Curated annotation (Swiss-Prot):
It is found in: Golgi apparatus membrane. Its EC number is 2.3.1.225. This is Palmitoyltransferase ZDHHC18-A. The DHHC domain is required for palmitoyltransferase activity. It is a multi-pass membrane protein. One of its GO terms (molecular function) is protein-cysteine S-palmitoyltransferase activity. InterPro entries: Palmitoyltrfase_DHHC, PFA4/ZDH16/20/ERF2-like. Coiled coil: none annotated. The keyword Membrane applies.
Length: 467
């Protein structure tokens, strides 16, 4: 009589059809795929141009309006006002206007096209580690663990919040922009006029833009008034001067309605720079004096000149998203599958619960079941089963649903039904209609510690539900 040969199956080695297909692709086919750059798979809501060299927010429709107003006003000024002022005043007027115009355009483009300081999102492994740390730090109650951390900056407690989108704790002074869907370092605000967020890497360009635009607008506004005043002094009157130079009226209207907001914005950001604050912190009142002396700004140097140098003249931090870098090819095979690829019974992490349920099952089976010990044809040999013999002979494995096995013993697992008393057969049949994992106890003599778990739902076998 020849005993059946069994092959142990490692449930971690199971693969879904999709993962098996992707891992067995020929090398030539993978090598023929074009390498993609990181900006092509960037998760944020940004637009990239010139092969990732230029980045803008998706809602950048106001940026053309900003550029258009600057260009229209400047072109009208250099075309209709500068010739008259050069003849009656000095040739330095167009030179000064040209320098200011170039400075405004360059600073605007740098603000719009520069990475504001976007932080890359956490990788799956990093996110899993952070979630594990959060779960371990939680209490034994049903309340969820806190999603905040506290750190000390200049002897002052600063709270770090968890970003559910980027799956990480935000560094100090970092905030998540809802329009760009990115976490930005030293987040100031999202400016639709420049079509980008204003943060750590482009704040100096933004400040230079609004200050230079204030000077340019004030300069054009003063030159236009001077032009119309000189024309009206010739005896024709102010109305005639407007009729002689209608473009000056357009410039006057644009500058009049924009100069107040631009000057106010420049003054507000000058105060922020001198205090080493951000617009986001000022609006929220994070370091307001109303909260007491202990809630003062921990980032200030208590010196206006030092704060200005740190904010505007500090070293330019590098971009962390590497938008023009290549996405690494996924050539390395995955040796360990994720929980999504494993059966539901094996995806559980609570091993204590599984061990406890198996122990109770074995104790109940020791008092009510008899297992057939061989698979050779003929009269089956039965023997009473004790708890010790079950612990040494039971092999529990997990396998996908398959057809009923044959009675052959060559290299296949021989399965035999379990002789169950009639009083329990009704319970076993009722359990077949439930959506619970089932256990089948085959006959090979293996220890429980060396054999993996396998699920089977063959209709002709005896099953016991796992409660």
């Amino acid at each position: 009589m020849k005993n059946c040969e069994y092959q142990q199956i490692d449930p971690r080695a199971l693969r879904t059809p999709s993962s098996r297909t992707s891992s067995t692709l020929p090398c030539g086919r993978k090598g023929s795929q074009r390498l993609r750059r990181k900006w092509e798979v960037f998760p944020g809501k940004n637009r990239f141009y010139c092969d990732g060299r230029i980045m803008l927010a998706r809602q950048c429709g106001v940026l053309p309006l900003t550029i258009g107003l600057i260009f229209i006003t400047s072109v009208l000024f250099f075309t209709f006002d500068c010739p008259f002022l050069v003849d009656h005043l000095t040739v330095f007027i167009p030179v000064i206007g040209g320098v200011l115009f170039i400075f405004v355009v360059i600073s605007l483009l740098q603000t719009s096209f520069t990475d504001p300081g976007i932080l890359p999102r956490a990788l799956p492994d990093e996110a899993a580690d952070i979630e594990k740390q959060i779960d371990n730090s939680g209490s034994s109650t049903y309340r969820p663990p806190p999603r905040t951390k506290e750190i000390l900056i200049n002897d002052q407690v600063v709270k770090l919040k968890y970003c559910f989108t980027c799956k990480m704790f935000r560094p100090p002074r970092t905030s998540h922009c809802s329009l760009c869907d990115n976490c930005v370092e030293r987040f100031d605000h999202h400016c639709p006029w420049v079509g980008n967020c204003v943060g750590k890497r482009n704040y100096r360009f933004f400040y230079a833009f609004i200050v230079s635009l204030s000077f340019l607008t004030s300069f054009i506004f003063g030159c236009v008034i001077t032009h119309l005043t000189l024309r009206s002094q010739g005896g024709n009157g102010f109305i005639q001067a407007i009729q002689d130079s209608p473009a000056s009226v357009v410039e006057l209207v644009i500058c009049f309605f924009s100069i107040w907001s631009i000057l106010g914005l420049s003054g507000f950001h000058t105060y922020l720079v001198a205090s080493n604050l951000t617009t986001n912190e000022d609006i929220k009142g994070s370091w307001s004096s109303k909260r007491g002396e202990e809630s003062g700004n921990p980032y200030t140097y208590n010196n206006i000149f030092t704060n200005c140098c740190v904010v505007l003249c500090g070293p330019m931090p590098p971009s962390l998203i590497d938008r023009r870098g290549f996405v690494p090819p996924e050539d390395a095979p995955q040796t360990v599958t994720s929980d999504a690829e494993l059966p539901a019974f094996m995806a559980k992490n609570d091993t204590n619960m599984c061990a406890q349920g198996t122990k109770e099952l074995l104790e109940s089976m020791a008092n009510s079941t008899v297992i057939q010990s061989t698979c050779a044809p003929g009269k089956p040999k039965t023997a009473p089963v004790t708890q010790e013999s079950l612990l040494n002979t039971v092999s529990i494995t997990v396998s996908p649903p398959s057809k009923p096995p044959s009675n052959g013993c060559s290299g296949r697992q021989a399965r035999r039904p379990i002789d169950v008393p009639c009083s329990q057969r009704g319970l076993k049949r009722a359990a077949l209609h439930t959506h619970k994992p089932m256990l089948r106890l085959p006959s090979p003599l293996y220890s429980l510690s060396d054999s993996p778990l396998i699920l089977s739902d063959a209709p002709d076998m005896g099953f016991i539900p796992l409660n």
